[in-house]
């Protein structure tokens, strides 16, 4: 992901076809170690593609990825059962609280890893 981001920054900066050295400068400016093999692979894969096409492809891939949530549902179902004889309003408040906490998760995506 870091190599794609650096590639896009280079293109936005005016380089139509950025070279390894261009991306190395961008990545080293923020303290990221560069794997030359991966960098070369990314440049080969992205060469000749427009930014709009790359973003479109990325959105399609992200929309097809499953997003978790199965564990949170199971935990929410277990809470009312554990509170046998408890107040239903209290259980609903707990359930809503659990849902809002899970919204803050990053879904396993790391921007620069």
Swiss-Prot record:
Q: Where is the region Disordered? A: 66-113
Keyword annotations: Phosphoprotein, Ribonucleoprotein, Ribosomal protein
Bias category Low complexity: which stretches? 73-85
Name positions with the PTM Phosphoserine.
100, 102
An annotated GO cellular component? cytosolic large ribosomal subunit
Read off the InterPro entries from this record.
P1/P2_N_sf, Ribosomal_P1/P2, Ribosomal_P2
Compositional bias (Basic and acidic residues)? 86-99
The biological process GO terms on file are:
cytoplasmic translation; cytoplasmic translational elongation
**Claim: Phosphoprotein is one of the keywords in the record:** yes
Instruction: Enumerate the GO terms in the molecular function aspect.
Output: structural constituent of ribosome
| One Pfam family per UniProt | Ribosomal_60s
Family named by the database record: Belongs to the eukaryotic ribosomal protein P1/P2 family.
Q: How does it assemble?
A: P1 and P2 exist as dimers at the large ribosomal subunit.
Question: What does this chain do?
Answer: Plays an important role in the elongation step of protein synthesis.
Task: Name it.
Answer: Large ribosomal subunit protein P2
Organism listed in the record: Drosophila melanogaster
Taxonomic classification: Eukaryota, Metazoa, Ecdysozoa, Arthropoda, Hexapoda
């Amino acid at each position: 992901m870091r190599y794609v981001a650096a590639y896009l920054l280079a293109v936005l900066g005016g380089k139509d076809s950025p070279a390894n050295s261009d991306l190395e400068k961008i990545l080293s400016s923020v303290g990221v170690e560069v794997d030359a093999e991966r960098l070369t692979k990314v440049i080969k894969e992205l060469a000749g593609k427009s930014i709009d096409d790359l973003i479109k492809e990325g959105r399609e891939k992200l929309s097809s990825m499953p997003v978790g949530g199965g564990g949170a549902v199971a935990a929410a179902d277990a809470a009312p059962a554990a509170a046998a004889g408890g107040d239903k309003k209290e259980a609903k408040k707990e359930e809503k609280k659990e849902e809002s906490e899970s919204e803050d998760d990053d879904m396993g995506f790391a921007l620069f890893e």
